[in-house]
Amino acid sequence: MVQIFKFLLKSNKSPARAHFRPSFLDTLRLAVRGGHGGNGLPKYGGVGGQGGCVYFVAKEGLTLRKMAQGLKDRRVAASSGEDSSKVSIFGKRGVDTRIEVPVGVQVYDEQQKLLADLNENDAKCIVAGGGTGGCTGNNFLGRPGENRIVNLDLKLIADVGLVGFPNAGKSTLLKAVSNAKPKIAAYPFTTIRPQIGTIEYGDLRSISLADLPGLIEGAHANFGMGHKFLKHIERTRLLLFMVDIFGFQLSPRHPHRDCLANIYSLNKELELYDPSLLEKPCVLLLNKMDKEGAHDILTKVKPIIDDLSSGLADCPEEVRPKRVLKFESIVPISAINSTRVTQVKSQLRRTLVRLAEKQFVSDGEQIKEQLQQRVGLVGPRIT
């Protein structure tokens, strides 16, 4: 009878497809606690050992998911300091706990105050200090270590961030130009997690390209998990916008936007999310040029795309930005046929090289200015 009831109560729901199971983790919440300070010894004036601290170290090649698998209960603690004794007047310090985290992690406390930005390999930060050992100042009673909740927020570090609406062909392009193998299908939101591909060149130079899930209108207000995806382009050096030359319609309930309206809409989403993103250099790809009528549309919209401010008057008010983008270049392509893909790779490289040269000159001028300020009237001026 028991077996019959088990059979009847057994759920007939099929498990979720592997594609929709969460495999990309970009946030993690941890409870961290520094070690308790050791007690002192009043009779001999002994001092207890300092409690150990918890610190993070950034390591390349690590992911938050791998890190989380090693921290099942999401709790991290350092060891306590040693009590003072007759044979050890000064107690030994507690052992520190070292936790490796992915490069690109930002550490926040519960009040969303930034504690550390670990964007370089081997960068370190203490997230929970150890308690003070017992001494005359605290009646020889060791103090508890720092106890707090920290949130780890991973922002992908890539040279180029690929931005666009769903079904624009971003994953197809990523597969064509890099070693990545993203899922590709003829429906929106095929990409449901960020992916990074590497563009390799004949001289062994490589460029990393981050493909983000498609945005929707209102992404700046976190519609469609917009914040979860937009944050990953903050650390990219170059933005690569990709737009369907025939426009895009999210669903029958949403209006159809032509390619110009889509460009303005993406422009506005970035402007509302973080205006500083508009200062990043950007390249525009107009995709699906292999279809009939594409070149007629291109001829019509190209002069406006060259100067987006000239088309603001005709832009729908709900997608009209206050400040427009200025594209470094505009490349019409067919990602599915790999048309002009080589040109895209060359353009990305040229733009990044030009940015590096500008940064080098800027850094040199800054160093020169700092040296002049230090020398002042004491030594010769640098000319």
Curated annotation (Swiss-Prot):
CDD domains: Obg. This is GTP-binding protein 10 homolog. GO terms for cellular component: mitochondrion; nucleolus. Residues 22-157 form the Obg domain. PANTHER family: DEVELOPMENTALLY REGULATED GTP-BINDING PROTEIN-RELATED, GTP-BINDING PROTEIN 10. Keywords: GTP-binding, Nucleotide-binding, Nucleus, Ribosome biogenesis. The keyword Nucleotide-binding applies. InterPro entries: G_OBG, GTP-bd, GTP-bd_Obg/CgtA, GTP1_OBG_dom, GTP1_OBG_dom_sf, OBG_GTPase, P-loop_NTPase. Belongs to the TRAFAC class OBG-HflX-like GTPase superfamily. OBG GTPase family. One of its GO terms (molecular function) is magnesium ion binding. It is found in: Nucleus, Nucleolus. Pfam families: GTP1_OBG (PF01018), MMR_HSR1 (PF01926). It comes from Drosophila pseudoobscura pseudoobscura. One of its GO terms (biological process) is ribosome biogenesis. May be involved in the ribosome maturation process. Residues 158-353 form the OBG-type G domain. GTP binds at residues 164-171, 211-215, 287-290. It comes from the Eukaryota.
